[in-house]
From Swiss-Prot:
Residues 265-267 are annotated as: G5. GTP binds at residues 128-135, 175-179, 229-232. The gene is infB. Residues 229-232 are annotated as: G4. PROSITE patterns: G_TR_2 (PS51722). It comes from Mycoplasma mycoides subsp. mycoides SC (strain CCUG 32753 / NCTC 10114 / PG1). The lineage of its organism: Bacteria, Bacillati, Mycoplasmatota, Mollicutes, Mycoplasmataceae. One of the essential components for the initiation of protein synthesis. Protects formylmethionyl-tRNA from spontaneous hydrolysis and promotes its binding to the 30S ribosomal subunits. Also involved in the hydrolysis of GTP during the formation of the 70S ribosomal complex. It is found in: Cytoplasm. Belongs to the TRAFAC class translation factor GTPase superfamily. Classic translation factor GTPase family. IF-2 subfamily. Keywords: Cytoplasm, GTP-binding, Initiation factor, Nucleotide-binding, Protein biosynthesis. This is Translation initiation factor IF-2.
C-alpha cells in the first residue's frame, strides 16, 4: 500500500513538472485574432495602434477629447486598452505568457474543477483596540476547545491555531500581535483571512484602534462579526457600542443591518459557543472550499532562524495537502520539507487546507506574507526561486521610481495615474472633518480621490502599514498639526509612502490642486534633523523654562528651527534661544547625549515633550 501511494505521488510530481515545462514553452499569440484583441501586458500607444491596425492619431484624438494629452510612447493601462477595443468594436482578452518569474502566481491562480473541491475550515482574525480582550478571547477559545492536558501547550510562535467546536467543525484562528501584522501580509498581496471578528469592550466603546481595525477589515473585503466583550462588568453598555459602530457602517441585524453582534465575556466564557456557531454559519454561507488532492500552496505567517534547526517557517495551507519531503518554494526561498509540526509541537505527516503548521527545511528565512507552492522537482524549484529573487529586485527598483506628488501632472496627462489615496491625521476632530470635506470635493479630471482613513492623532506605524496595502496609484499621508516620530518616518521611507505635513488647511488643498495642474512650487523642502525627548524641567527667572532633553535621533543644532510636539501634536513652532551641554554653550548635540535648551517666546515645555529640530532647504 505504501509503495502504491509513493508511486502515485511520484507520477503526480512528474505530471506537474511536465505541465510546468509545457506552460513555460508556450508562446501567446497577441493582436487581433478572429475579432478579439489578445494581449499579455500593457502596451504603448504606438504598439497598440499597430496591433489593431488603426491610425495613431485616432487613439491620441480619443483621449484628447477626454482631456488627456498622450503621446505615442505613453503606456496604456489595461482599462484604457479595453476601453479602446470597445470604441473600435473589438472584444478583448488577456492571456498570460508563463515565465519562471510569474509561474508561482499562475499556479496559485489555477481554478480547480468544482468536483475536486471540498469544504474547508474558515480562517478567522480577531482585531480590536488594545485591552479590549483580544488575547483573553483567543485564550478562552483555545482552552474551551482543546484537551485540558494540551491547553497550555499551544505555541505562540506558530501565529495560528485550529480548534474543533462542539459540533465537530474546525475553525482556524490567526493569532497576530495586532492588526499591523494582518496589514503587513495584505500589503504583500497575501489574503489570509475569511472572517474578521471585531472585539469591542462594552464598558469602553469604540476607541482609536477599533477605528483602525474597521479600516483594515473593510479594505480586506471580508465578512465582519462584532463581539461585544466584558458584558459582565457593571458599567457595560452594549447598546452604546452598537450605536457608536453605526457611524462606521456596522449596523446590527436587530437594527436592520447585516452585521452579526454577539454580547459576551471572554474571561467568563459567556457566549463563546454562540460566536463559534456564527463563524461556522457565515463560513457555510461563504461556501469556503479547497482542493485537498493536489500539491500544497498557501502563505507564510511567520518565520525566523533557529540556531539549531535553521530556517523555520509557520505556514497556512490554503490549497492542496502539504507533506514531509515536499519541495516548497516560499517567496525567494526553497527547500525539501524535513519536518512538519502542528500548534502543539506534535510531528505531523501532512497538513490539509486551512491548517497552520511549522515547517523545517527551507534554504533561507522567508518573509511573512510570502506565498508558497509545492513543486516536487528540485532543479525546477531552484530555478524558479532564483527567478523570483530577480523579479523581487526588479520590483523594488520600480517601486523607487513610483508616483510622487511633485510629478503627478505628467502621470495624469499620460493617463498613468487613475487613483490618489489619502490618509488624514489631525490634531482635532474639527480639523479632521474640515480636511475630509475639502479634500473629497477636489475634482481632478480622470482621477479618483479615495480617503481610506481620517482620524485624530499622530501619524503612526499603523497608518503607514495601511497605506502600504494600496496597490494602485499615488498614496499620501497628510498630517495636520501632527508629526510622525523617527521610527514612523523610517518605515514610510522604506515603503515609499509620501508624508505631507501642514498647519493651514487651505495649504493642503492648494498643494494637491497645484500638483495636479503642474504648478506645485518645488523650491523648498523641509529636512528633519533630529528629535529629542524632554526629561527634566528647570525654571530660570531671567531666561524662562529650560527643557532638559535626551537626543533620540539625529542631531539638535543651535541654528535649527524647533517644534514642540506633545502626544504627536505640534504645540509650538519657533526658534532655539539657547543650547547647552553640561552647562556649556553648544553648537549641536548628537544622538545619545543630553542637553538643555530654551525656546524664543515659549515657556510651556512639559516632561516627555518631543523637540523636533528641522531646517528649510532650497531645492536647486
Amino acid at each position: 500500500m505504501k509503495k502504491q501511494v509513493k508511486n502515485i505521488k511520484k507520477q503526480k510530481a512528474q505530471n506537474q513538472t511536465k505541465n510546468i515545462k509545457k506552460q513555460l514553452k508556450e508562446e501567446v499569440n497577441t493582436g487581433l485574432i478572429d475579432g478579439i484583441f489578445v494581449y499579455t501586458e500593457p502596451l504603448s500607444v504606438i504598439e497598440f495602434a499597430t496591433k489593431i491596425n488603426k491610425p495613431l492619431t485616432a487613439i491620441l484624438k480619443h483621449y484628447f477629447n477626454q482631456g488627456l494629452l498622450l503621446n505615442q510612447n505613453t503606456l496604456l493601462t489595461e482599462e484604457q486598452m479595453g476601453e479602446l477595443c470597445l470604441e473600435f468594436g473589438f472584444d478583448f482578452k488577456k492571456e498570460t505568457t508563463v515565465t519562471k518569474e510569474n509561474i508561482l502566481q499562475t499556479l496559485l491562480e489555477t481554478v480547480d474543477d468544482e468536483k475536486h473541491l471540498k469544504e474547508r475550515p474558515p480562517i478567522v482574525t480577531i482585531m480590536g483596540h488594545v485591552d479590549h480582550g483580544k488575547t483573553t478571547l483567543l485564550d478562552s477559545i483555545k482552552n474551551s476547545n482543546v484537551v485540558a492536558s494540551e491547553a497550555g501547550g499551544i505555541t505562540q510562535a506558530i501565529g495560528a491555531y485550529q480548534i474543533t467546536t462542539n459540533h465537530n467543525k474546525k475553525i482556524t484562528f490567526i493569532d497576530t500581535p495586532g492588526h499591523e501584522a494582518f496589514t503587513e501580509m495584505r500589503s504583500r498581496g497575501a489574503n489570509v483571512t475569511d472572517i474578521v471578528v471585531l472585539i469591542v469592550a462594552a464598558d469602553d466603546g469604540v476607541m482609536p484602534q477599533t477605528e483602525e481595525a474597521i479600516d483594515h477589515a473593510k479594505l480586506a473585503n471580508v465578512p465582519i462579526i462584532v463581539f461585544i466583550n466584558k458584558i459582565d462588568k457593571p458599567e457595560a453598555d452594549p447598546n452604546r457600542v452598537k450605536t457608536e459602530l453605526m457611524k462606521y457602517g456596522l449596523v446590527a441585524e436587530e437594527f436592520g443591518g447585516d452585521i452579526p453582534f454577539i454580547e459576551g465575556s471572554a474571561i467568563k466564557k459567556i457566549n463563546l459557543d454562540k460566536l463559534q456557531d456564527t463563524i461556522i454559519l457565515i463560513s457555510e454561507l461563504e461556501n469556503l472550499k479547497a482542493n485537498p488532492d493536489k500539491f500544497a500552496s498557501g502563505v507564510v505567517l511567520e518565520a525566523h532562524l533557529d540556531k539549531a534547526k535553521g530556517p523555520v517557517a509557520s505556514v497556512l495551507v490554503q490549497q492542496g495537502t502539504l507533506e514531509i519531503k515536499d519541495i516548497m518554494i516560499a517567496g525567494t526561498t526553497f527547500g525539501s520539507i524535513k519536518h512538519i509540526e502542528d500548534e502543539f509541537k506534535h510531528k505531523v505527516l501532512k497538513a490539509e487546507p486551512s491548517k497552520p503548521v511549522v515547517v523545517y527545511g527551507l534554504n533561507q528565512v522567508p518573509k511573512a506574507g510570502d506565498k508558497f507552492v509545492v513543486i516536487n522537482d528540485e532543479k525546477m524549484a531552484r530555478e524558479i526561486s532564483e527567478a523570483q529573487l530577480k523579479k523581487q529586485q526588479e520590483e523594488e527598483r520600480r517601486t523607487k521610481q513610483a508616483f510622487t506628488l511633485d510629478a503627478i501632472k505628467q502621470h495624469i496627462d499620460e493617463g498613468e495615474l487613475k487613483n490618489i489615496t489619502l490618509i488624514i491625521k489631525a490634531d482635532t476632530q474639527g480639523s479632521v472633518e474640515a480636511l475630509k470635506n475639502s479634500l473629497s470635493k477636489i475634482n481632478i479630471s480622470g482621477v479618483k480621490i479615495n480617503i481610506i482613513r481620517a482620524s485624530v492623532g499622530a501619524i503612526s506605524l499603523s497608518d503607514i502599514s495601511l497605506a502600504s496595502t494600496v496597490r494602485d496609484g499615488l498614496v499620501i499621508v497628510y498630517g495636520f498639526n501632527v508629526r510622525p516620530d523617527a521610527i514612523v518616518r523610517k518605515k514610510a521611507e522604506e515603503d515609499h509612502i509620501e508624508i505631507k505635513l501642514h498647519n493651514i488647511i487651505y495649504k493642503v488643498i492648494e498643494e494637491l490642486e497645484d500638483a495636479a495642474k503642474g504648478i506645485l512650487d518645488p523650491e523648498v523642502k523641509e529636512l528633519v534633523l533630529g528629535q529629542a525627548q524632554v526629561r527634566a524641567l528647570f525654571r530660570h527667572s531671567a531666561i524662562g523654562t529650560i527643557g532638559g532633553f535626551y537626543v533620540l535621533d539625529g542631531i539638535i543644532p543651535r541654528n535649527a528651527k524647533i517644534r514642540v510636539i506633545r502626544n504627536g501634536v505640534v504645540v509650538y513652532d519657533g526658534e532655539i534661544n539657547s543650547l547647552q551641554h553640561q552647562k556649556q554653550d553648544a553648537k549641536e548635540i548628537k544622538a545619545g547625549f543630553e542637553g538643555g535648551l530654551t525656546i524664543k517666546n515659549f515657556n510651556d515645555i512639559k516632561e516627555e515633550d518631543i523637540f523636533e529640530a528641522y531646517k528649510i532647504e532650497q531645492i536647486k
